[in-house]
């Protein structure tokens, strides 16, 4: 059988002419109104909740409200060029962000697009920003520590890998400082970090990035920035985008730490979006699902077992557990932790670090209130040496604060009470720490040992920090073997304890502080 070329071309022409190329009416719609980054769209009867929509000018949006005859969507980015009557298309995709080691050292927005001027990010993978948290069977108990390098946290409210530890306090109490110090201290510890800045001034975010760079911490950190000038939708989505980037490491048998700074502003952004979408307001004008907003985010931070990782990586990674540790930050108003969002997040997390304005103003920094700061699961993850030595510190501090309040009214104090007050003053002074100077485990062990065994009792309160610095310097120069043993074993054997005691006694005799 011979084919005639002209017949074939005629057949193709006929087919092309008869082709109906019009888009399916289900998947296109028309903009009815656009206000404050919220679009109402007529049509789109086939759209899914959370689906990406394509607007003119290569702009995308997110379908959030599915109503009987219209769809409410938030525009991701500029919306000034969108006008009534514009056509909108469904994309059939859920919002995804790039993930992987290519993002380390970069500053990106809530959509994973670089905003640091260092060129494009060639990430090999993308992942959806909304994911279901690992189930009970996939999880493993928290048993390894995350060292923050801050004496008061590592000793009194220890954090474990896979834990959610809330940092809560009024504005200007050092919440970001605690989180940034924790990131800086992960250098060389194999923990990847994600810092999510939500609703902060661009200058503040730039300052944090500069500090991370100065301390060599940016190389293992991803910064997700949704500044105060960005739209409410971007501020609301940035936390989920950062979480997905952190989960990439968790699901490959690595350890990651994520800081959400702060979730109060994310709740405000979500409230704004919800009210503009005409959703019914509840307590403090927040929508009804504001608890779910934070619980579905924070439940994704977990320690997962080797079977879960093997299943996710299709057998590529075997015999490794992974973790994502979350440090959410909440800003309170005048220390009111019983407000709506603070109580929600306190009930979701595994403990909280409470920072107080009065302590901060009194020069006690980090301004951690030892009485109401707790870590519900971190104790199991604390290093042996710190666990041994830190038991007395918390009790000393709590009793000191209580006694100090009574001592104001009492003129004649008995000897035991006076001693306890003196010890408390010294412990309070010892737990002060300058910013960007995290301590290693051996330094913390030496400081705690000196406090517990009365070596500070005859040192003037004003000289405590100088004493501590001098002790650390002498241990570093004269007792390197002891330091290495403590760092390697993370424990204090009887011999090492005797050596440490002798070293401190030797230092006190020299009085080199």
Swiss-Prot record:
EC number(s) reported in the record: 7.1.2.2
CDD domains: ATP-synt_F1_alpha_C, ATP-synt_F1_alpha_N, F1-ATPase_alpha_CD
Keywords, in A-Z order: ATP synthesis, ATP-binding, Cell inner membrane, Cell membrane, CF(1), Hydrogen ion transport, Ion transport, Membrane, Nucleotide-binding, Translocase, Transport
Pfam families for the chain: ATP-synt_ab, ATP-synt_ab_C, ATP-synt_ab_N
PROSITE patterns associated with the record: ATPASE_ALPHA_BETA (PS00152)
Site (Required for activity) location in chain: 373
Keyword Ribosomal protein: no
MF-aspect GO terms: ADP binding; ATP binding; proton-transporting ATP synthase activity, rotational mechanism
Classification via Gene3D superfamilies: 2.40.30.20, ATP synthase alpha/beta chain, C-terminal domain, P-loop containing nucleotide triphosphate hydrolases
Membrane topology: Peripheral membrane protein
UniProt KW Repressor keyword: no
Protein name per UniProt: ATP synthase subunit alpha
